[in-house]
Amino acid sequence: MEKAIRNFLSQESAGGILLLIAVAFAMLMANSPLAGFYQGFLGTEVQVRVGALDLHKPLLLWINDGLMALFFLLIGLEVKRELLEGALSSVAQASLPTFAAIGGMLVPAGIYLLFNYGDPITQAGWAIPAATDIAFALGIMALLGSRVPVALKVFLLALAIIDDLGVIVIIALFYSSDLSTVSLIIASIAIVGLVALNRKGVTSLAPYGVLGLILWVAVLKSGVHATLAGVIIAFCIPLRAKDGSSPSEHLEHSLHPWSTFLILPVFAFANAGVALGNMSLDTLMSPVPVGIALGLMLGKPIGVMLFSFVAVKLKLAQLPDGIGWKQIAPVAAMCGIGFTMSMFIASLAFEQADPMFGDLARLGTLMGSIFAALIGYFWLSKVLPKKGV
């Protein structure tokens, strides 16, 4: 397990650097003479027509609805594996990261709502600081290499996966638009087909892919966010075949490099470009960016630490062997790296609002995530033993 985690983190570390480059490139283009080209490129209409089916969306929405569905497929595969065989497969293992993740979602959301109380438009962004970017958080931790105990890596991985599960539930419940009955019926039929494949022990990924594509289109047309199709597909793919092989893990390993080196950087490039030219100091200090930034920087670590501490004191959970509160605290700070996940929720929360709110949300996410990453990295570096000690 330690080797698998090391391989995973080494890939995430490189991906984290690529994400930073993508964000920097997006900000550079959005604040340069190329800003018009940048916005025009993302607004390019892309049409796919097959018979009566007609999908017609700007490139930005193809990225957010299509590529991110593959990312959520990967998240679903990771969640299923951890629930059945990994760090969340027993109550003892799952209890502490579960309480930590709940606190890490509730407190940041509360801080955001405190700053945006009374404004029904901006209140829609309450879930933005509740998210943790698993790839970026693990990538920052990976920079410290072998100094980080395996138990601490597993704790962050488990916490981030539960956080992702919470985000999936939030999207399903709070960020779905008017529902189409016909599309939901088609989606339900596709889900029944996927479950039947699983129950029959079908291990070939091709049938899951065909039904999964039908499900994605139906969910896209239904008013439920299309990324949830990826999670449903993941939960239907068998973890273990009769011969001991794992179709689920095979797909997970195949998707990881695509997610790390293509999907997330492309998403970051498409969503992180915020034009700063028309923003005053008053705008930067407005409730949306401040609520998000403080929710990530302060709300995340406070929520994670508070709920973890109470759970341990009430004997509902226990600290991992060899890990103390001084190691948990900087990891709690790293959970404030919302980055791509927070930006994704922002794109849903303010989809129908003035584009300015989306820009402010992305700016708050960038500020909060960068500070959380710096605080978490240097704090953890300080409390961990030096190399060779």
From Swiss-Prot:
A GO biological-process term: regulation of pH
Annotated GO MF terms: sodium:proton antiporter activity
Protein purpose: Na(+)/H(+) antiporter that extrudes sodium in exchange for external protons.
Chief location of this protein within or outside the cell: membrane
Known catalytic reactions: Na(+)(in) + 2 H(+)(out) = Na(+)(out) + 2 H(+)(in)
Originating gene: nhaA
Entry-linked NCBIfam families: NhaA, PRK09560.1, PRK09561.1
Species, as recorded: Shewanella oneidensis (strain ATCC 700550 / JCM 31522 / CIP 106686 / LMG 19005 / NCIMB 14063 / MR-1)
Protein name per its UniProtKB record: Na(+)/H(+) antiporter NhaA
Gene Ontology CC: plasma membrane
Annotated TM spans: 17-37, 59-79, 95-115, 124-144, 154-174, 177-197, 213-233, 261-281, 292-312, 328-348, 363-383
